[in-house]
Amino acid sequence: MFSGEYEYKIDSKGRVSIPPKFRSQFADGIVLNKGVDGCIDAYPLPSWNEATNQFQSLPIVRNEKSRRMSRILFSSAFNLELDEQGRIMLPPALRQHAAIKDTLVITGVSNYLEIWSKESWNKEQALIKKETWQIFESAEPHK
């Protein structure tokens, strides 16, 4: 279970530390992907494999939408390992997607992490603060 908010600086080689309390959950690997909200999603490899296996087992008709969904899921996925210092290298394409230049925020979101640029996270936090009650009132149980 991932929770909390952690601010880090990206180094000159594009590396960032994963919060120490989460590193053991990424012992088998970490998969980074473009998040739909302009962030980077980070999944433990076993969780990613489970989700993609479920996706691939669906009776999907090979139509335009299903091909696009496959592209979204797989074309921007990067399978990485933490180095000895608990860091990962953020691929340039994902840094660009998330507009990450120097300071970033790693947030825990239940079963995965999100990696945001500091600026984008501040904007997201402002929206969350403004819409908190509407979000809770319209929330459906999480499966």
Language model region names:
Residues 1-8, 12, 22-80, 84-85, ...:
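Flexible "stalk/tail and boundary" regions
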